Amino acid sequence: MSEKVEKEIGEQITKLDLSEYRSIELSKLSKENIGQKIRTFGWVANVRSQSTITFIELYAHYRTVKCVYQKKMHLTMCTSMTVYGTVSKNFGKKDAHEFEIQVEGVEIYNGAIAPSFPLNEDSSVNAILTNGHLGLRTKKRQLFLKARGHLLKIIRDFYFEGEYTEVTPPTMVQTQVEGGSTLFKLDYYGEDAYLTQSSQLYLETVVPASHRAYCIMPSYRAEKSRTRRHLSEYTHVEAEMADIDLDGLISSIEALVSYSMRRFYEEMKSDILSVFPEFEFHKVPRTPFKRIKYSEAIELLKSKGYKKEDNTDFELGDDIPDAAERYLVEVVGDGCPVFLTHFLVGHKPFYMRKDENDKGLTESTDLLFPGIGEILGGSMRQDTYEDLIEGFRRENINIDPYYWYLDMARFGPCKHGGYGLGFERFLMGLMRYESVDEATLYPRKVSRCQP
């Protein structure tokens, strides 16, 4: 800003009786304020100057308001400023604003115009994430922020209505849940400790007291996977329930997913369409969802001629990769979520309960979501001391750090089960993001630990 313009702006403010201007948050302004003198604060989202007039789109709290200043000003995106003016009818014919502010004075915060903004709506995802602190000023990332917060609230509402107790288990642990090779190790006052892979074991200890418990906590996996759906740190939605069987567990998952999808799309629809006018909303699935056993899925893939990456047939014992999972969603679920159930004992962790009719299988399930694949894993939990000891031995795990977990099988055990939902994957699916990075505030993965 030139010294002359800066001086003119300053002089204009001094001529105003600021006590006449009512302070109102920008997001709370409406056409009900027409005729009122107001003061409001925000950031410049867009600016256009003509010879003697400046049109400013001022942004704050997910809301943009049109401001008209009868002076030519040089402003840049993200400049923070306070506007004094009168709310009036919108006289523009080419925009959808219900009202506008006829500006009578402005105060640039600290008198500093922001530098030229390095991003725009066409910037790549990588560029936006590399400049993540500034990327949040773009419309797409602002929508992400609102969508993320909204989905978290919806999930918590589901659990609150279902009388689940929320807890916050520790994230520094000396146990493992999903295999030692994916642990982040740290020095805990001279002892080995790890960042948690899952809060499941601690959640199980809460169940005898609360009957139903959940947590929404960070989990960590030191997996060097470079895929569009893997993170090294992610938000883990986990729940455990007492006195339940596998069918009941799956029904509870269906209820969570259907409830969340329905409310999310109902309440976020206008926000999503304002940024993505052509957005295709997923069908909210009817319950029960389609189910297919792991062994049946292997046979289906073989019968359909769906090959592995090395162009050989799938065989019992093979992992089903994400591309094949997405294929199963289309073929089995007709584009709606599908439960993949009854995985082999040797392919699942020590804590999963064996199927009573086939001890080679677990009472387990993964939920496959359209466009992504697996977003949730769950199972009935082992509840006998002997079966837990067998599981520890099978996986060559030292039982000493698990003394407290083994006590659960000695002091009033019950039939119980639970699951863990990858929150970012769920949001990625709902928003049709190409990568889980887009569903994450500041992604942490093999290739990224900044900003």
Swiss-Prot record:
InterPro entries: Aa-tRNA-synt_II, aa-tRNA-synth_II, aa-tRNA-synth_II/BPL/LPL, Asn-tRNA-ligase, Asp/Asn-tRNA-synth_IIb, NA-bd_OB-fold. Keywords: Aminoacyl-tRNA synthetase, ATP-binding, Cytoplasm, Ligase, Nucleotide-binding, Protein biosynthesis. GO terms for molecular function: asparagine-tRNA ligase activity; ATP binding. One of its GO terms (biological process) is asparaginyl-tRNA aminoacylation. It is an enzyme of class 6 (ligase). Gene3D superfamilies: Bira Bifunctional Protein, Domain 2, Nucleic acid-binding proteins. It is found in: Cytoplasm. It comes from the Eukaryota. One of its GO terms (cellular component) is cytoplasm. It catalyses: tRNA(Asn) + L-asparagine + ATP = L-asparaginyl-tRNA(Asn) + AMP + diphosphate + H(+). Its EC number is 6.1.1.22. The keyword Protein biosynthesis applies. Belongs to the class-II aminoacyl-tRNA synthetase family. This is Probable asparagine--tRNA ligase, cytoplasmic.
